[in-house]
Amino acid sequence: MGHSRPKYNSAVSTFCWAVANDEPFTVNDRGTELELLYIDDLVEGMFDLLEGREQHCEFNGVETVLKEDGRYCCVPVTHKVTLGEIVDLLEEFKAQPTTLMMPKMPNGSFAKKLYSLYLTYLPADKFKYALKMNADNRGSFTELVHTADCGQVSVNISHPGVTKGQHWHN
């Protein structure tokens, strides 16, 4: 999974391009599972090989089994996801400017890698979006982004002599 040509050699790139550009696309079976390797993980695996730190494996059918004395070199970081999971994440990314909600994207996660790819297809004019500023006689408050597990990022401006806040949100 990396930057490739939509509508040619990658369903993931096709979906990213279509969602980012408001183009129609078809998913024939949301339950179809893919095993994906992100380009950065492949490059890291190649550097490991060049530096003598490669991973070895054997194969049990199509399953990779890491084995120190395995006959094959492999990149152990792949992601098994369904087409439905991919499309659902892309729709969450697309909705972010409206909902301000960022999906969970832990380091190394498929979601974070997919988001990086999605952004490469996002037209420049979609990188900016209107924010709602709530203003009153005390100042203003503008929410920038929400997360499910890390709170929110916002800008709070108080006029001189005004104290705001002094409370917590769950």
Q: Which ranges hold each PLM region?
A:
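Short secondary-structure junctions and interdomain/linker hinges
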Residues: T26, F93, P97, A148-G151
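Residue-level detector of flexible, active-site-proximal loop/helix-junction positions
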Residues: T32-L34, H79, A148
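A short glycine-rich, His/Asp/Glu-containing loop-to-beta-strand
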Residues: F127-N170
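NAD(P)-dependent short-chain dehydrogenase/reductase
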Residues: M1-E35, I39-R53
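Residues that form generic nucleotide/phosphate-binding pockets
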Residues: A18, L89, F93, L144
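Residue-level signal for pocket-adjacent positions within structured domains
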Residues: D22, D29, G70, D136-G139
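Mid/C-terminal beta-alpha module of Rossmann-like enzyme folds, strongest
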Residues: D41, D48-A135
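Active-site donor-binding loop signature of nucleotide-sugar glycosyltransferases
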Residues: D29, V77, P160
